[in-house]
Amino acid sequence: MRPDAFPESDLPHVPHEPTGGRATLLLTGAYLGLCVLLGGGTRQGLPAEAVLQLLALPLIVHGLVRWSARPRSTAARLALAWAVLVPVGFLLQCLPLPPSLWTTLGGRAELVEELQAAGVAVGWHALSLDPDASLRAALAWLPPLALGLLTLGLHRTQQVRLLQGVLVIALASAVLGLAQLAGGPESPLRWHAVTNVQAAVGPFANRNHLAALLVLALPLEAAQMINAGARIVAGEQRPRRTAAVSVGIVAGVLLLLS
């Protein structure tokens, strides 16, 4: 990993930075924090998820406008194409098919027998055995699609700052998890009705969700520490951020407790 893989926030200004970049960075960070705060439930179709999905729609439009104004690499084009094809695939599964077609698909014979036994006409049915679940899966793809598009529209320096924001979110979640452990199963800091009451869950309902966030933060923290070490070796004597180290310590403790 190169020493400059995770530079400090005082990177030099890069010319030709798209206008509105700072506002987009703040918007992306705020939406990311909102996703962590409101997401992570154990059930699908929660009102909080609907709020995040509705907010994602104008953000996707804004992200497309920002992304179209920047040079687009082949990798970015392929990533965007894949990100769009995934929810489209879910939506296609919800389209109704004629009986002559869907009854020939795998796993449909038993369903046809049950419909006939119940006296229900074998009419048009979707490709998906659970169209509602397929629709929820497509809608669940909106927030990550919005975040991805917004991030592609950011300058590299701003993308690094956004990653540093992920470290801050992970640190806050880890500290919240420790406070939940200290407060016990009835801690008011557990705001999900269905949750792991004997474990640290942070802003989520499931301890595995918190563990996934902390695991995601570990390589970011490692890059931050490697960059800081390289700058110290280079003779730069400026104070170092301690957030990355704190994330590593707290994350290690919580991973052991999980």
Residue ranges and their predicted role:
Residues 75, 101-105, 184-190:
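A cytosolic-side transmembrane-helix exit/cap motif
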Residues 42-43, 47-48, 74-77:
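N-terminal membrane-targeting/anchoring modules of bacterial envelope and secretion proteins
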